[in-house]
Amino acid sequence: MTFAAWLAATVLALAAASCTTVEPGPNFVVPDEQFDADFFFCRVEPELLIVKRCGPGEGSDNNNCHFNSAAVSGMALAPHPTVDCADGHPTNRAQIGAGSAAQGNLQAASLVMSRDYTTAPIYLRPTGQNHPRTIFPKEDPVVDVIRLWAQK
């Protein structure tokens, strides 16, 4: 074996040995972050997801952006009647039960939410930082709704 062949074989063997994976174990789970559902139904959904929809110019009349699953892959929402609320809590739990459109919207929005709202896609994308259009500016009052939800 020539020196060049030996060197190539050694480098290849070292490279192969350095490529390893870490086995997370049998009980690995991704932490499930829970955000206040009542706050979502009574504040976030009506003030952000419904009112802001596509922002100035209403870019899509085809069920308004996120309410059209064909147009959005990240946070597809389902239209439904506004959840009845009083004192910050839904008054009719049947409107938000398992399998309901409202519950699906909560799950979709929670996936793009973070305790540090300034890193959450639900804040970044509509403020134009990671989205093809600006839906609302960073100074919009609805940002406070997102911030408050992150704390709940």
Predicted regions and their residues:
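Aromatic- and Gly/Pro-enriched helix-to-coil junctions and flexible linker segments
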Residues: 19-152
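Sec-dependent bacterial lipoprotein signal peptides
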Residues: 1-18
